[in-house]
């Protein structure tokens, strides 16, 4: 159970990071960050 929960947490965090990266890369002040 703990392993599945950890995996779900990582997946959720990854999704949030992806959304943040998209909004950041669309922002002229932020799009120069690594990963854009």
Curated annotation (Swiss-Prot):
Q: Which domain of life is it from?
A: Eukaryota
Answer yes or no on keyword Transferase: no
Q: Which residues form a coiled coil?
A: none
Proregion span(s): 1-21
Would the keyword rRNA-binding be found if you checked this record's keyword annotation?
no
- Identify the keywords attached in UniProt to this record, alphabetized: Acetylcholine receptor inhibiting toxin, Disulfide bond, Ion channel impairing toxin, Neurotoxin, Postsynaptic neurotoxin, Secreted, Toxin
Q: Where in the cell is it found?
A: Secreted
- Expression across tissues: Expressed by the venom duct.
What is a single molecular function from GO for this protein?
Answer: ion channel regulator activity
- This protein's GO CC annotations: extracellular region; host cell postsynaptic membrane
The disulfides recorded in the entry are 24-30, 25-36
Q: Membrane-spanning regions, if any?
A: none
- A Pfam family that the UniProt record links to this protein: Toxin_8
Q: What is known of its domains?
A: The cysteine framework is I (CC-C-C). Alpha4/5 pattern.
UniProt function note: Alpha-conotoxins act on postsynaptic membranes, they bind to the nicotinic acetylcholine receptors (nAChR) and thus inhibit them.
- Family assignment from sequence similarity: Belongs to the conotoxin A superfamily.
Q: What is the protein named? A: Alpha-conotoxin-like Pu1.3
Task: State the species of origin.
Answer: Conus pulicarius (Flea-bitten cone)
